[in-house]
Each structure stands twice: as structure tokens, then as C-alpha cells.
Amino acid sequence: MKAGWNAAVGLTIARVVFEPPRAAPRWMQTPHNPLLDTLQPYPFERLRALTKDLQPNPALRPISLGIGEPKHPAPKLIEDALMAHLSGLSVYPATAGEPRLREAICGWLQRRYGLALDPATQVLPVNGSREALFAFAQTVIDASRPGATVVCPNPFYQIYEGAALLAGAKPAFANSDPARNFAADWRQIDDATWARTQLIYVCSPGNPTGAVMPLEEWRQLFELSDRHGFVIASDECYSEIYFRDEAPLSGLQAAVQLGRPDFRNLVAFTSLSKRSNVPGLRSGFVAGDAALLKKFLLYRTYHGSAMNPMVQAASVAAWNDEAHVVANREAYRAKFAAVTPLLAEVLDVALPDASFYLWAGVPGGDDIRFTLELLAQYNVAVLPGSLLAREAQGVNPGRGRIRLALVAEEAECLEAARRIVDFTRAYRA
């Protein structure tokens, strides 16, 4: 099945090189923050450049496993809460959020992790974890200190790197370790780099790997933080999609278990997008060290990032209900149970600890070529792993793997899996 694949597209596989444009005369230049010029193209932008001349097989309906956007229906209780609070349009919201929302968040943290946090000082509502993860770096990074560094897992959620660069810091990367379920190997960061580090982003469960960080690694990070004074930002937005009986450990939970009930130099970010299938709601929270959150609230007060009252009301309803979360998790479990064994026949793939991604190795190790030919011949879109990582310690840890987001309904995910199996059986690496 070769429809849409031609030599011209084949040449594209050689890799798209993104070169900065030649500098225009100053009078023609648009005034801007020069740090914007340090940003890398987003993975989907790079993939669009790779596929711009490609014609997917028109005989097959397109299926996308590329974007991690939940496709399960939004819970009715959230929709009802939004509609019931439209009067909130007529008031300015407080940046710190309404007390009832902070209390609902603390109630969820108590039920989920057994944590007792102060709703007045240890939690802040945010407009989804993405904006908060970015904005937090702008709050805690002191770019005037020589060599300001932000440590990130590799591969990684691209916001971490962008946040570091626009805060005036340099990102440093800890590659994933295939021998440890693709968890980030923090031991790859040397002492000199740790000494310059001001912030580390932890992603647990990981994107794209699904790996959950165990308690012992939290202990090691806390010891490093105490020694060097850096802040830990734990991105936990996939925490409610897991496949075994034991729920993923939170950084906050780990801190309490290790005798750090004040969450010193630690904050955790959680979102309703994946937990409750409401990515358009843009709602989440950050919790942890009260002193850090006081500074973050000051930043957010000027940044104009208050959550609107209707979204706050809907968020209260979401955090107070667990039935829809259990049903959502069961739907993902059913999909992964059906799809993973199929793909394991032809790809290097296994059930992750958590998240809604499969992190699959491809025959021959060329993730770009595999992605393009799969799209051209079978009209299935996936994301090349090399676009989610950076070259570090001489390797790109995403190369040779693809990320598959099993976000659509089970039947569509199964159809995509069958096409991938058929394609891979005929694929010549």
C-alpha cells in the first residue's frame, strides 16, 4: 500500500534543518525580546514542515495518535456547573482564586494523597498546568547569577525548555534510561551543573515515557536540593491515568513520607485536562512550599492570570467528584489492554506506569522515516520521539521511538493499531 508516497517526500526524511533567518537591517526588524530568538520550533511545527509535501493515503480515513488531547466526553457535572454560574461574567476574579476552590483542591489532595495543606497559603488555582509551569520559572530564576541553569528530563514537555530560556537560564538535560523504564537518569547531571541549577522540572508520570519516579529518587533529589538550593517543580498532570492498583506517587506525598512536611523548595502542578477530559477548561493548581507560592502569587497578580468565576465553579465540581475519574481511568485501561499486545507484536513497546502514551521503539531506529511512511501509506499520524528530545551526552534519547497518544475512542485506537501492525510487517528498515 504505497498511495501518497513518492521520492520527493522520501528526500524530506533527510531531516528538516531550521536555520535562523539572516538578520535584516535594524530599521526593518520588529522590536522584541531577544530571548525569543533562542526558542526552538515546537515538535508539531517541525512535524508539519516534514509532512508539508506528503499526501496521506486518501483511501483510508485519517487517524491521529500524535497530539495528547483527551477525546473522551467532558463530564456533564462540569458542563452544568459552568452553565449555572454565568453570572460570574460580571465580576473580576481574584488571582488567588475563591476560597471554596482552594478548599476543594485541598480536599482532593487529602483524599488522594492523605495530605493536609493550608488552602490559604499552600495552593493556588492556575489556568491549566502549561501556563503555570512556564510562569513559575519566571518567578524563581535569578538570571543575574552566573550560569543560571534549569534541569529537565529528556525527552521532555517542551514548555520546560521555553520557560528556562525566556527566564534567561540555560537548560541542562538528563536523558531517559531504557533500563529503568525510560525514567530520567538524574545521575547524568554533574556536580558543577547542580551547583548552578536554580530549578528542576520533574515529570512524573512522564511525558512521553509514562514512567513514575519512585520514593528513593525523590530522596536523592531532595538531598541535592538541600545541598545546592534549587527548586523542584513536579509536573503531575497524568497522575490519574494509571494501569495498576497502586496510584502514582506525588512529589508532595514523597516529601511528607521523607519528613519534609513544609515542602521546602518543592511545588507540584496538577491539571483537570487529563483527569477530567476538559482540556478546554484550562484549570489546574499548584501546591507546596508556602513561601514560593507567595512569590508566585505576586507574579501572577501583575501577570493577569486569574481564573474566571465560571471555570472556578466548574473546577470545584470536578475536584469534588471522583466517579467520572474512575470511569475515565477504566476506559484508558481497556484501550491499553487491547492495543498494547497488538503493537508489541511488531514494535518495542510495553504498558507504561501511567499516562495515555505508548513510547514505542521502531524497526531500524529511524523514527522520522517510520512516521512519514506510516502517514503516507496508512494515514495514521504519530509523533517522532526525536522531536521531543534534545541531543545530550552525545545522543538524542528520543531517536528510534515514536509517541502514540491513545486518546480517541477504543475502536479508533484499535483501527490505528491494526494499520500500524500491517505497515510494520511490510516495513523495510
Predicted regions and their residues:
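A short helix->loop->beta-strand "cap" motif at the edges of active sites that frequently abuts
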Residues: A148, R227-F230, F263-R264
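N-terminal small-domain helix-loop-helix segment of the aminotransferase-like
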Residues: W27-E131, A135, A318-W319, Y427-A429
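Conserved glycine-rich beta-strand-loop-beta hairpin in the small C-terminal domain of fold type I
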Residues: Q312, V316, Y332-T340, V349-V362, ...
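Conserved core of the PLP fold type I
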Residues: L89-E223, E240-I241, E246-R260, C413
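Conserved core segment of the aminotransferase class I/II
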Residues: Q253-R333, A337-L342, T424
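PLP-dependent enzyme catalytic core of the Aspartate aminotransferase-like
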Residues: P261, E373-V382, A389-A429
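Helix C-cap/helix->beta junction micro-motif
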Residues: L54, P58, A167, R227-H228, ...
